[in-house]
Regions:
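Alpha-helical transmembrane segments of integral membrane proteins
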Residues: 107-213
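Gly/Trp-centered helix-boundary motif
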Residues: 1-134, 138, 142-143
Length: 213
């Protein structure tokens, strides 16, 4: 059991570290579009050259051979992977073709870059929401515990009401009440506030119980 937890913790720490180091680990900006490489396949590194020799890791760029079917084929060109070039851990000479470790999406954006930068945003939402829930829970639980009486009863009734609400339906209801198109900062703060609003009652009840004891 301890070994399983250690492995899980190491994997989680690795994912968090990769997300935090996204600007160094990703070969492209997450919003950069490659119009000639829409839905391009992943381009994995190779260690064995065409003549069977073990060489420095290289990548075979892909080219679009059928624009109608969006079909790509790997070229015979062997482009070596470079270390720490232009502030990026791993990259290739883009004059010989771009490198997409996990391919591209329908808009021609690098999936690997978007995955790591998206993870940063998700981790930020989780951190801000947890901090908001903690602060709100401490405030409400502290007031309820020290005040007592009807105020305590009212605050804990609100906390109980929030606890019984399915969080997913609260998120959907709030999203439906907002404009159809939201900017990234608006989405970030909306998710953070909703998740904080769903999490503060647990903290509040715990703080109130500690004070009352």
């Amino acid at each position: 059991m301890r070994r399983t937890r250690a492995i899980g913790g190491a994997l989680l720490a690795g994912l968090v570290l990769a997300a935090l180091l996204a600007p160094v680990l990703t070969p492209h900006a997450p919003l950069r579009q490659f119009t000639d490489y829409e839905n391009a396949p992943p381009m994995r590194p190779h260690l064995v050259s065409a003549d069977g020799r073990i060489v420095w890791p290289f990548v075979r760029p892909v080219k679009l051979v059928d624009r109608l079917e969006r079909r790509f084929e790997a070229t015979r060109d062997e482009v070596p992977i470079r270390w720490f070039n232009s502030g990026v851990l791993l990259s290739i000479d883009e004059s010989r073709g771009p490198w997409f470790p996990l391919g591209t999406d329908p808009l021609g954006r690098d999936v690997f870059s978007r995955l790591l930068f998206g993870a940063r945003l998700s981790l930020s939402v989780a951190f801000v929401a947890s901090l908001g829930a903690l602060l709100a829970g401490l405030a409400v639980g502290g007031v309820a515990g020290f005040a007592g009486g009807r105020l305590e009863t009212a605050l804990m009734a609100v906390a109980d009401f929030v606890l019984v609400l399915p969080a997913i339906y609260v998120v959907l209801a709030l999203r439906a009440a907002m404009p159809l198109v939201l900017s990234v900062p608006q989405v970030f703060w909306t998710l953070s506030l909703v998740l904080a609003a769903a999490g503060w009652p647990v903290v509040a009840r715990g703080v109130r119980g500690i004070i009352a004891a």
